[in-house]
Amino acid sequence: MPSPRRTIEGRPLGSSGGSSVPGSPAHGGGSGGGRFEFQSLLNCRAGADPACARLRASDSPVHRRGSFPLAASGPAQAAPAPPPEDARMNLNPSFLGIALRSLLAIDLWLSKKLGVCAGESSAWGSVRPLMKLLEISGHGIPWLLGTLYCLLRSDSWAGREVLMNLLFALLLDLLLVAVIKGLVRRRRPAHNQKDMFFTLSVDRYSFPSGHATRAALVSRFILNHLVLAIPLRVLVVLWAFVLGLSRVMLGRHNVTDVAFGFFLGYMQYSIVDYCWLSPHNVPVLFVLWNQQ
């Protein structure tokens, strides 16, 4: 005789006989046990019966694939996949980025320390009027007006040639500085006071220093094309250096603004010297100027 089958609830089911429980759906029918077992499987709820939950979990395709192994079933867990190469590179900052950030921090700190004439209440506030006078000596407007006046008053071809190239150098300096300032758009230091002499819209930016570029350009131009005594030559170099330093002391620029300005002005003279205007390469310009 075959052993009686048991339902998930633990009660015996007769294969052909009646159920021991009166009023059950399997009572009095040969196929009632099969219907009772089928309905019991349909009516079981997840979590209500542990056996049903285990049955449903074991029959699921995800469990059969082994995508979610039990913590206690295996001796060791699978090692996590290593991050991709790009992610590992992004987590480690480059040496160049660290160097640039360090240089910027040193630049801001040193510029603030050297801004001793940024205001009347600063450490060297009493020297501020003298520094502002030095600021005017390196402004572009006085240099342009002075060069034009000397060019009009000159009566020699050699003098006009030198002055015309100086005018060309000053215009080139204004153009290059304005373009770079518009591209970089670096704000002036926070301790700067807005009392500069004759500023334009682009002058609200600080990189590079126009006074520093002009000082380097003009001093190199004068030393190469004017015959001066040694004390005057030393005075020209000293003027250019003090003018650049005054930009930081007044709080107008950072140290890197002035340093790059000196470099740019030095290179600008090389451009002017390469494109030197003379009666031989641009005779029309000198003839027209001579007729004025």
UniProtKB/Swiss-Prot annotation:
Keyword field: Endoplasmic reticulum, Hydrolase, Immunity, Innate immunity, Lipid metabolism, Membrane, Nucleus, Phosphoprotein, Transmembrane, Transmembrane helix
Modified sites of kind Phosphoserine: S24, S67
Catalytic activity: presqualene diphosphate + H2O = presqualene phosphate + phosphate + H(+); presqualene phosphate + H2O = presqualene alcohol + phosphate; (2E,6E)-farnesyl diphosphate + H2O = (2E,6E)-farnesyl phosphate + phosphate + H(+); (2E,6E)-farnesyl phosphate + H2O = (2E,6E)-farnesol + phosphate
Region: Disordered, residue numbers: 1-34, 66-86
Region (Phosphatase sequence motif III): 246-257
UniProt region (Phosphatase sequence motif I), positions on chain: 181-189
Region feature (Phosphatase sequence motif II): 208-211
Protein's UniProt keywords contain Nucleus: yes
Residues on Lumenal side: 153-161, 247-257
A Pfam family of this chain: PAP2
Record's compositionally biased regions (Low complexity): 10-25, 69-79
Official protein name in the record: Polyisoprenoid diphosphate/phosphate phosphohydrolase PLPP6
Species this chain originates from: Mus musculus
Gene that encodes the chain: Plpp6
